[in-house]
């Protein structure tokens, strides 16, 4: 049988994913990825957009599924591409990631979905989590967007 992961590799076009920088006071919500790509690494909560779902609805659903944290009115921060090639230089994964910023309506974490772990991390401690450089950029941008939004 074809696994879900197999269905996301070597596709003819990118997949759309969403992510959120969720703030609670001076902390951001990070999740430890439970699935490939990059299982075990820390990232923003998020995931795949479903057919018929708006990106804003998708990001609210994904944050809730993975962390139990409710958000509303997410604001667009940026769109970035995550492209991973194999040893033969073939594109194995290509995700177009649409990142939002939001404030937590409830800070209590209830782990679920694809996340292996989730926690509130002080913005001063974020760099200790070996995040993808684009994730660090999006977190930095999110503060500006939130303060001007």
Question: What kind of region is each of these model predictions?
Answer:
Residues 10-14, 41, 89-96, 115:
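A generic structural micro-feature
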Residues 99, 110-142:
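NUDIX/MutT-family hydrolases
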Residues 24-65:
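Conserved Nudix-box catalytic region and its N-terminal flanking loop in Nudix hydrolases
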């Amino acid at each position: 049988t074809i696994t879900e992961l197999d269905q996301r590799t070597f596709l003819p076009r990118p997949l759309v994913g969403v992510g959120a920088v969720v703030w609670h006071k001076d902390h951001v919500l990070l999740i430890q990825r439970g699935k490939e790509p990059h299982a075990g690494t820390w990232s923003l909560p998020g995931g795949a957009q479903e057919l018929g779902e708006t990106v804003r609805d998708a990001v609210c659903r994904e944050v809730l599924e993975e962390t139990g944290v409710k958000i509303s009115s997410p604001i667009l921060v940026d769109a970035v591409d995550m492209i991973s090639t194999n040893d033969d230089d073939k594109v194995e994964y290509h995700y177009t990631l649409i990142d939002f910023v939001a404030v937590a309506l409830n800070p209590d974490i209830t782990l679920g979905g694809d996340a292996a772990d989730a926690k509130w991390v002080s913005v001063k401690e974020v760099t200790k989590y070996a995040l993808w450089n684009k994730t660090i950029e999006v977190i930095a941008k999110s503060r500006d967007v939130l303060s001007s939004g």
